[in-house]
């Protein structure tokens, strides 16, 4: 399998942002600062993201969102797959270029 190319220097990314509660019309594509991997963390360049019923439920129900710790403005989506593009200090299980999948509370729909 061909190893994906990795750009570890990205400072900006695009992300779907939830800025108020409601239906799909409240979602906006925004250019945002790319997070940096801290100690013990990795950063993933998302190549695919899925939306499940809980994602949609939290966009329209402030009480549920609050129970899950969601604060506005927020990212959107919990399921993702992508490529590790940055590795923080102390991380030994992953390396830049590794293909990964997982879940992240309301931050999956981004690049």
Where are the language model's segments positioned?
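Basic/polar N-terminal segments that are highly enriched at the extreme N-terminus
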Residues: 1-13
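Short beta-strand or tight-loop elements
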Residues: 11, 25-30, 42, 80
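Generic preference for hydrophobic
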Residues: 15-17, 100
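Residue-level signal for short segments within beta-strands and strand-turn junctions
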Residues: 17-19, 60, 84
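Extracellular beta-rich ligand/substrate-recognition surface
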Residues: 18-26
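Glycine-rich beta-strand-centered segment in the early N-terminal region that forms part
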Residues: 33-50, 63-107
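Cytochrome P450 core scaffold surrounding the K-helix E-X-X-R motif
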Residues: 54-60
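A short glycine-rich beta-alpha junction/loop motif
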Residues: 110-111
């Amino acid at each position: 399998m061909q190893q994906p190319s990795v750009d570890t220097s990205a400072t900006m990314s695009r992300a779907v942002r939830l800025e108020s509660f409601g239906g799909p019309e409240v979602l906006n594509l925004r250019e945002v600062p790319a997070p940096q991997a801290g100690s013990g963390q990795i950063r993933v360049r998302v190549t695919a993201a899925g939306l499940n019923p809980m994602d949609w439920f939290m966009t329209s129900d402030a009480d549920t969102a609050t129970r899950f710790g969601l604060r506005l403005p927020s990212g959107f989506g919990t399921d993702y797959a992508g490529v590790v593009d940055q590795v923080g200090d102390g991380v030994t299980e992953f390396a830049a270029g590794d293909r990964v999948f997982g879940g992240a509370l309301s931050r999956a729909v981004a690049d």
